[in-house]
Amino acid sequence: MEKLTILLVGSGGREHALAWKIAQSPLCGRLVAAPGNPGIEAVAELRAVKATDADGLVALAQEIGADLVVVGPESALEVGLADKLAAVGIPCFGGSQRAAQLETSKAFTKDFCQRHGLPTAAYGVFEDAASAGAFLDTLEAPFVIKADGLAAGKGVVIAPDRAAADAAVVDMLGGRFGSAGARVVIEEFMHGEEASLFAVCDGKTAVLFGAAQDHKRAYDGDEGPNTGGMGTYSPPPVLTDALIDQAWRELIVPTVEGMAAEGNPYVGVLYAGLMLTPTGPKLVEYNARFGDPECQTLMLRLDSDIVPILLAAAKGELANAEPPKWREEAAICVVLAAEGYPDAPKTGGRIQGADADFGDDVVVFHAGTTREFEGRLVASGGRVLNVCALGATLSEAREAAYGALETISLEGGFYRTDIGWRALQQR
């Protein structure tokens, strides 16, 4: 096979992990990332085109003669990048605007689940506080309140009592998340443990692509506000083969078939956020891309070339593709965040030690970083670095990641010291 020119869209830790893995492929001749970050720059050419500039990205893909475009963030799918690439005949690993509604509209997904009988929490969708209140009357605390649209992982409130639930509804409908909160989805609270399951899809076929468990709260002990994710590990012991099989049969397969039947064939990553309830896995939410930071641990564990499977998915040829192979080891990712994250992260803090050689089993991915004058590395976002490690056991991987973190400094930065606690406790 001839070497490919690949365009990677995005600039976070997830995209650095994808770039790192794509660059290892013998099929990758040229890798261009837009807009990228200083970590990605080590393995790819960077172009200053934003992930939400669909027309600019199509022009860039045409200019470089891209054989494949790999989309990292959901924001690029929401503006129809995959549709615009399809119109000019460029294969894209990422969903159409309509298919991406599985992530970009929680109401769309809940209604889809209802139409196809998929296991999920009872719910209602509301545009005014009065009707939302009437539905809350029928539920018991705690209450789950979600903004309908994209809110960077922060649009979900678990309200312990009715007063907090009413306040969350008023807050969202009042414009806290802009148009994303113009509708709210209210759900019954599901009891159980959460885990994430990943599938790569080509519109008609789905291939299992690993599992992970993440930590959404900002601080140790699962305290503090929700974030985009403070750390993750893979594989999660709680997600047994039997549970994966059940989720595959009851959620993934009917979703891919249902989307195709409704004229919205799903291409790209289908990321199922699962609640492992006493009666089996139920859907919390779908995401239309690799999780961040879940992707980072999957890339460390992936023991086969990623490019053929991405290309096969983009071209509708997954049925003939080699399934991915996985390393036996456990992987962990710990997020180093800027002071004030998630509410008001302070940017500009100086980063030191991130470029050290930590050995083969530790990889540091850049998330929110930029280079100032004289090449100095500083924080440019809320989640700054992802320190990832492999180990024969989760304990070993954890030791390696935290050992590396001790030698990395970020002014005012913080990280959780308990990533992986659930799995270690279960042992």
Swiss-Prot record:
Mg(2+) binds at E285, N287. Pathway: Purine metabolism; IMP biosynthesis via de novo pathway; N(1)-(5-phospho-D-ribosyl)glycinamide from 5-phospho-alpha-D-ribose 1-diphosphate: step 2/2. The keyword Protease does not apply. ATP binds at residues 136-196. Binds 1 Mg(2+) or Mn(2+) ion per subunit. Pfam families: GARS_A, GARS_C, GARS_N. It catalyses: 5-phospho-beta-D-ribosylamine + glycine + ATP = N(1)-(5-phospho-beta-D-ribosyl)glycinamide + ADP + phosphate + H(+). GO terms for biological process: 'de novo' IMP biosynthetic process; purine nucleobase biosynthetic process. This is Phosphoribosylamine--glycine ligase. It comes from Caulobacter vibrioides (strain ATCC 19089 / CIP 103742 / CB 15) (Caulobacter crescentus). The gene is purD.
